[in-house]
Amino acid sequence: MSNCYSKDTCVFLKKEDLSLLDQNLYKEELSRNQLIELIKELKTNPFGRRHMISFWNWSNMNKKALVECAFETIWNIRKKNNEYYLDMCLIQRSGDMLTASGAGGINESQYAALLMMIAKVTHYKPGIFTHFVANEQIYDRHIDAAKEMLQRVDKSQNQNIKICITTEIDDFFQLTIDDFEIKNYKPQTPQLKLDLGI
């Protein structure tokens, strides 16, 4: 797992090393690790109302080729039948339905995995994943692929697909892709190739 998702999320530097960062970035924000603070707060103040991570950083937006599409998560603990669940809401400003933000796209997959990872290390059950996309689109160049996908839908082929974390590792930063297992997934062929839009 990479040590940093983006400079806007967290920086693994000591305060005295912040001078190594790009001078144009807002250093006070970056000196706090939102991910570590989220995990700590979920453990020590589970029903707090400030469990959030935000990638939105006005100070360096004009320096990026693409500003974050999926830019904020909100986390809540919910008690049901004497068990505690970690729910997450992902907020996305814009999304390419077929490649990123639609059902099973990379945004949903990666954030579902993140929910599972944080639930594991905070000792809650993974709860409800809510995904809000303000501007969902299908690009013209993907129309034929979208039609093909609609023809391929076969609910009997992929029933009860599950993604599981298979390790007992309890440290978020030690988890890797090898600690995940996908069960009951049967990919359809041929694989559709879709260009990403930037």
Report the location of each language-model feature:
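Terminal, non-catalytic protein-protein interaction segments that mediate quaternary/complex assembly
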Residues: M1-I198
